[in-house]
UniProtKB/Swiss-Prot annotation:
Name recorded for this polypeptide: Tyrosine-protein kinase Yes
Active site per database record: D397
Ranges of residues in domain SH3: 92-153
Domain of life: Eukaryota
Gene name of the record: yes
Covalently attached lipid (N-myristoyl glycine), positions: G2
InterPro entries in alphabetical order: Kinase-like_dom_sf, Non-receptor_tyrosine_kinases, Prot_kinase_dom, Protein_kinase_ATP_BS, Ser-Thr/Tyr_kinase_cat_dom, SH2, SH2_dom_sf, SH3-like_dom_sf
GO terms assigned for molecular function: ATP binding; non-membrane spanning protein tyrosine kinase activity
Keyword Nucleotidyltransferase: no
Ranges of residues in domain SH2: 159-256
């Protein structure tokens, strides 16, 4: 938000859908392992398969620089561990939990802990933050629930990544530094109750690539990839294939490094926070309505802080919208941590180390990216927007300046929903330098009809920003000229070096009738499969 300065089988994605964007979302993203056990009416002792490994942002969503999605807190590879020396259930039937990551306390009520520490859960009714007793130290305090799992459960295994899509799996396994034989196990996207073994491979034809093997479950509880070799547990299956190729493309050698996820919220009960708890450290940028800072919360935690000029929006309206925004949890959305709700309003979010996508493309490492990386970034943005679409929400200001980048080309959508609250007369009149005319669908710019379909139009403009490395849309045209020409049917021509098939997707996004524009679900599917289904013969050029 701000001033504009000049393959497993997947079900078919729905290409078109009517707009119903006036519905307010009532549910949040539940995360990779299903709902919290408290929502399902379970006690901690019963919590063995549901949401005990990282939720919502796992394993993509680490704090930017150095903890970033696709990077990982632990850069060293870990050998496979099959047996845990400590039993999960001690006398009395109490389930013990084990820490999956290190955590440094952010408040006096938190517990610091190290990966492998064990806990007894005292109270898990809060969902995101549990009261626990450390078995290692005997101390009581709060811990982030997505940092622990029941001891000896599958969720506590290094190699188990839970509900991770095939595409995100390949992004992780193909990161630089991973070698042939790097692997993970995840839930199957297509078969309920089954798992997938995903493995990094190499051959002369494809180079580095990933293979995926379905792990099926027997009625007696066993597991197999092929029926001739069956195992009583997933742990035994993993152990076998680390010792024997036995039909796989390569032996399992190293576990794919996990990424420390974002906690859900900055701390327990830290939502409306005092201004004094924030320190503004480095100003990262400024726009018409405020500034963005790298800062520190409570002297312990690096965050991003957006400061809004007084009068930009009503504090009451902002707080109401922020309550919705904080429930929109997805690994391709920048999480909202906390707010200062009195003017000047402060918005506290995850810090993303590479800054905005626009700056990254124009002045950062993005200048040197080729089409495969740019299309992958676009597919990540479409993934986040498809979630916003499912939640019946609207962004209203989708453009490269409002996408943030972390290490390893991870993209997250920022500032969703804020544009609706701006009270500046020049902005609300949808004219002048403060309003992003060049990114806005004609029905929204002319008549104020903002829907998810106007977001689709904006996404088409964002695609041009990606392939031109941050060029301002409609070069050589002023805002009024853009409005007039677009209303008459003008559309930007295919950018230099851009494949015609990608330009055709842009043109689909720019259909005059909103309901004729594709859904974000369809756009995501198109982009994720682009180099297998649409442009399999792609060869790198000078620019793309």
């Amino acid at each position: 938000m701000g001033c504009v300065r000049s393959k497993e089988a997947k079900g078919p994605a729905l290409k078109y859908q009517p707009d119903n964007s006036n519905v307010v979302p009532v549910s949040a993203h539940l995360g990779h392992y299903g709902p919290e056990p408290t929502i399902m009416g379970q006690s901690p002792a019963m919590k063995t398969q549901n949401n005990s490994h990282p939720t919502a942002l796992s394993p993509f969503g680490g704090v930017s620089s150095p903890m970033t999605p696709f990077g990982g807190a632990s850069t060293s590879f870990t050998s496979v561990t099959v047996n845990n020396p400590f039993p999960a259930v001690i006398t009395g039937g109490v389930t013990f939990f084990v820490a999956l990551y290190d955590y440094e306390a952010r408040t006096s009520d938190d517990l610091s802990f190290r990966k492998g520490d064990r806990f007894q859960i005292i109270n898990n009714t809060e969902g995101d933050w549990w009261e626990a007793r450390s078995i290692n130290t005997g101390e009581n305090g709060y811990i982030p629930s997505n940092y622990v799992a029941p001891a000896d459960s599958i969720q506590s295994e290094e190699w188990y990544f839970g509900k991770l899509s095939r595409k995100d799996t390949e992004r992780l396994l193909l990161l630089p530094g991973n070698e042939r034989g790097t692997f993970l196990i995840r839930e199957s996207e297509t078969t309920k109750g089954a798992y997938s073994l995903s493995l990094r491979d190499w051959d002369e034809t494809k180079g580095d690539n990933c293979k995926h093997y379905k792990i099926r479950k027997l009625d007696n509880g066993g597991y197999y990839i092929t029926t001739r070799t069956q195992f009583m547990s997933l742990q035994m299956l993993v152990k076998h294939y680390t010792e024997h190729v036995d039909g796989l493309c390569y032996k399992l050698t190293t576990v794919c490094p996990q990424v420390k996820p974002q906690t859900q919220g900055i701390a327990k009960d830290a939502w409306e926070i005092p201004r004094e708890s924030l320190r503004l450290d480095v100003r990262l940028g400024q726009g018409c309505f405020g500034e963005v800072w790298m800062g520190t919360w409570n002297g312990t935690t690096k965050v991003a802080i957006k400061t809004l000029k007084p009068g930009t929006m009503s504090p009451e309206a902002f707080l109401e919208e922020a309550q919705i925004m904080k429930k929109l949890r997805h690994d391709k959305l920048v999480p909202l941590y906390a707010v200062v709700s009195e003017e000047p309003i402060y918005i506290v979010t995850e810090f993303m180390g590479k800054g905005s996508l626009l700056d990254f493309l124009k002045e950062g490492d993005g200048k040197h990216l080729k089409l495969p990386q740019l299309v992958d970034m676009a597919s990540q943005i479409a993934d986040g927007m498809a979630f916003i679409e499912r939640m019946n929400y609207i962004h209203r200001d989708l453009r490269a300046a409002n996408i943030l980048v972390a290490d390893n080309l991870v993209c997250k959508i920022a500032d969703f929903g804020l544009a609706r609250l701006i009270e500046d007369n020049e902005y609300t009149a949808r004219q002048g330098a403060k309003f992003p005319i060049k990114w806005t669908a004609p029905e929204a710019a002319l008549y104020g009809r903002f829907t998810i379909k106007s977001d689709v139009w904006s996404f088409g403009i964002l695609l041009t920003e990606l392939v031109t490395k941050g060029r301002v849309p409609y070069p050589g045209m002023v805002n009024r000229e853009v409005l007039e020409q677009v209303d008459r049917g003008y559309r930007m021509p295919c950018p230099q070096g851009c494949p015609e098939s990608l330009h055709e997707m842009m043109r689909q996004c720019w259909k005059k009738e909103p309901d004729e524009r594709p859904t974000f679900e369809y756009i995501q599917s198109f982009l994720e499969d682009y180099f297998t289904a649409t442009e399999p013969q792609y060869q790198p050029g000078d620019n793309l």
